Amino acid sequence: MNLKSDFDKAYIKANEVLVRSSTIQSFPFSSKKLVKEQSQIICRSYGSAKKYGINITDFGSESATIFRFGGRSIIFYDETKPEPHITFSILHEFGHAILEHDFTKKNGENYHRYEVETNFFAAQLLMPEQIIREIQKRGKRINSLFLQSTFGVSAQAAEKRIETLAKMNSEWRSENEKEFDDVILFRYADFLNKVCPNKYDYDFEYEYARQQERDNWY
């Protein structure tokens, strides 16, 4: 049995959402609106759990959890947490559904693998690697405070993202993983230019070639 985390799948699935979502126009964005747009999953606070006949103590210490109720999936989240924490927690649980994790095995030997994959999925949605690396190429120093203020994430999420990206070389990614790189940079160009304007001279030949490539995407 393969218990190794499937980072490639989590990365590609997150990229697919970034490309097709109309909810994500900039960063930060509403995790609840994204979940509603991309699925039939309902987001509800812990405070509304009683309405569904669920005891809040069943959640233990989790910040969010996903339940099957009446044939539908519901993400319950702890509304007392800070907004960045709630956002990440909701996307983490959303990741379980998108990555088609077997919930019957969530508490078994696959638990750790599932958690790592969904954390990676949520981080890529909230702080896309392609955008961070492009900002870095433009001369901006990437640190925890920058990620927190730019993407609306918690200090913990920002620090973990920096740690993860420091261990990865984007040049080693497969063609499937790189498929949406240019699309994502093009789609969120306004956000990029607002956060870190490109100071390099405009290259008409390069831009023409890029536009021809984009035209082939549609």
Describe the predicted segments one by one.
Residues 1-218:
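Active-site hotspot residues in diverse enzymes, especially metal/ion-binding acidic/histidine motifs
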